[in-house]
Design a protein with these regions (language model features):
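A short, sequence-level motif marking secondary-structure junctions
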Residues: 50, 90-95, 173-175
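Acidic, Ser/Thr/Pro-rich low-complexity intrinsically disordered segments
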Residues: 2-45, 52-56, 63-65, 69, ...
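Predominantly extracellular/luminal regions of secreted and cell-surface proteins
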Residues: 86-114
Length: 177
């Protein structure tokens, strides 16, 4: 008999104190009934449609307000093929902004506010552009956590000024600039 295999959890993070919807993808997850987290206070229930039917592989997660920030593990299953392998899941304290596609040019970059966890999907070997307004001398931290959430994403972060001049960049896999 095959066994359940969890390939991704989206979004890979949630803000503590809120309820969020998670979608899982993988193999042999048909009729997955549960998500099991490394902290039992993270509770997810299968999402139901307007007719009360379970929406396949979609769950509603309640994240307790007092839960410690950090990484947790999650597994999916409970259906015909058992419980899956684990994936990382991050609990943070910043509101989340999901960008289904990142702009491919500086001119078409979406403006975002500071103080958000941005979840985006840059295309391979391409920049995914975002725009933020900063004041001269303002210090900010930009961090990519792709490798912390079981992602194949290997980031290169760069900061440009409005004329397109690169001000700072980093090519490490765990990027902080």
């Amino acid at each position: 008999l095959p066994s359940a295999s969890l390939e991704s959890v989206y979004p890979p993070s949630a803000t503590r104190g809120i309820q969020t919807e998670l979608t899982i993808k993988g193999k042999y997850l048909e009729k997955a009934l549960a998500l099991q987290f490394s902290d039992p206070s993270l509770k997810a229930a299968p999402k139901k449609d307007e007719n009360g039917e379970v929406v396949p592989n979609v769950f509603t997660l309640d994240v307790p307000k007092g839960l410690a920030l950090g990484r947790y593990s999650v597994a999916g299953g409970g259906g015909k093929f058992g419980l899956s392998n684990e994936k990382s899941f991050v609990v943070n304290d910043l509101p989340e902004l999901s960008l289904s596609e990142l702009a491919e040019s500086m001119d078409s970059a979406k403006e975002i506010e500071l103080g958000y966890t941005v979840i985006g999907f840059p295309k391979a070997s391409r920049y995914g552009w975002m725009r933020v307004k900063l004041k001269a001398g303002q210090k900010v931290v930009i961090e990519s956590e792709g490798s912390h959430i079981d992602s194949k994403f290997s980031p290169c972060l760069a900061v440009f000024d409005q004329s397109g001049r690169k001000l700072k960049s980093s090519t490490r896999s765990d990027v902080l600039i």
